[in-house]
Amino acid sequence: MIKQYLQVTKPGIIFGNLISVIGGFLLASKGSIDYSLFLATLVGVSLVVASGCVYNNFIDRDIDKKMERTKNRVLVKGLISPKLSLVYATVLGIAGFALLYFGANPLAMWLAVMGFVVYVGVYSLYMKRNSVYGTLIGSLSGAAPPVIGYCAVSGQFDAGALILLAIFSLWQMPHSYAIAIFRFKDYQAANIPVLPVVKGISVAKNHITVYIIAFMVATLMLTLVGYAGYKYLVVASAVSVWWLGMALSGYKTQNDRVWARKLFVFSIVAITALSVMMSIDFMTPASKDLLTYIG
């Protein structure tokens, strides 16, 4: 039973988000780490993400059973009752928000609330099923964790937080479109209006290329504005150029599914590399904050 309760929280997604939280947190810490704050932020975000994933599993159980990738999920197979899953999700969310509020700061909690509302209320409940722009809206919630990690330390939403939001939002787009291409039949069977299904794979390839170029620019801004050093810049540039090269190779590929899977895998390598580099090659910018939270 414990295994099912763990599975429904999507541990892989939680782990991936924690990497970005750590990146944002350590970027803002600039070598001076408050370990109790660090722990509270990691656990708090983990609980909120877990809550969102359980709610998502509850909402998506009707379409999950139509997809090969998701047909064996806990709620689809009835291993946990829908009502119990809602209670579980609610408890996880309340615990996570409370921990961020009292263990970090109110700004971190409110950022988590906004990310949660976008993911569960806007994306999962409506946009995913009804709009080709669902991925774009969902990317905002996917970018929340590193911003929460950053603001847990800084206590303010400044240019650094805005750049992180841009980097991780833009990264989500080619990452998600790649999944939609190599899982094309799944999304088609479930009638989910993702771009590759609605507009075609060739159009999706164009969007992937444009978003990766925008991602390249956003990653460079951390150094150009003064938040990260030149070691980060070198890695960010190399990763972005390689990812763009992979995207461009898609125009000549004979097998879109294989190409998209490779692009997806490298997207994870890319964002992990950036998270690690911003954690260790940080700087203090001369510019001041855009928006300061006053508690």
From Swiss-Prot:
**Statement: the UniProt record of this protein carries the keyword Lyase:** no
Protein's name according to its UniProt entry: Protoheme IX farnesyltransferase
The UniProt record's further free-text remark is: Carbon 2 of the heme B porphyrin ring is defined according to the Fischer nomenclature.
Q: Which organism is it from?
A: Erwinia tasmaniensis (strain DSM 17950 / CFBP 7177 / CIP 109463 / NCPPB 4357 / Et1/99)
Q: What is its main location?
A: membrane
Entry similarity comment = Belongs to the UbiA prenyltransferase family. Protoheme IX farnesyltransferase subfamily.
| MF annotations from Gene Ontology | protoheme IX farnesyltransferase activity
Q: Pathway, according to UniProt?
A: Porphyrin-containing compound metabolism; heme O biosynthesis; heme O from protoheme: step 1/1
Q: Which GO terms describe its biological process?
A: heme O biosynthetic process
Q: How does it sit in the membrane?
A: Multi-pass membrane protein
Q: What is its EC number?
A: 2.5.1.141
The reaction(s) catalysed by this protein are: heme b + (2E,6E)-farnesyl diphosphate + H2O = Fe(II)-heme o + diphosphate
Task: Tell me where the transmembrane regions lie.
Answer: 8-28, 35-55, 84-104, 107-127, 132-152, 162-182, 208-228, 229-249, 263-283
An annotated GO cellular component of this protein is: plasma membrane
Q: What subcellular compartments does it reside in?
A: Cell inner membrane
Q: Which InterPro entries match?
A: Protohaem_IX_farnesylTrfase, UbiA_prenyltransferase, UbiA_prenylTrfase_CS, UbiA_sf
Q: Which UniProt keywords apply?
A: Cell inner membrane, Cell membrane, Heme biosynthesis, Membrane, Transferase, Transmembrane, Transmembrane helix
